[in-house]
Amino acid sequence: TIHPSDPATVFHVVLVQPEIPPNTGNVIRLCANTGCALHLIEPLGFPIDHAKMRRAGLDYHEFTAMTVHKNWATFLNSMQASMAAASGSDQQATPSQPPHSNARPIPFSGRLYGLSTSGHKSPYDHRFLPGDCLVFGRETSGLPDDVQDSLGTDHLLRLPMRPHNRSLNLSN
């Protein structure tokens, strides 16, 4: 269960290879308003400065802790480094926010959950912790197989929806 009234309840929202600029802009706005960090995993289906993405995100870009990662492996390494830094290890953490951002850094819990049509567990039956990562796939094809494999079936969740519909729009 997510407790949105608790100000410490913040997550990492991860978009793997997003394709539609306005959807990503809307998620930027969502993250700015909820205090979540946003991670974009390349390749993106558009340039990071795409006008439609900026327009959909309104003026919230500077209030979002957003990081663009070259690929899934780079993202995982970055998150492991941030955990090591938080625990006092010698490794340097990659910042989870741009230098101009007013957003605060969000610690990583070490737990990643993919939301996928191939998931079997409901997120409503799960207790999320601050710092958890919620991983979403491409708008047209969902989470790539390698990402699903790295998460494992116990960490794939399925949002309830009608049986023959293929996806929900996270940005709505």
Placement of each model-derived feature along the sequence:
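Post-transcriptional modification and biogenesis factors for structured RNAs
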Residues: T1-N172
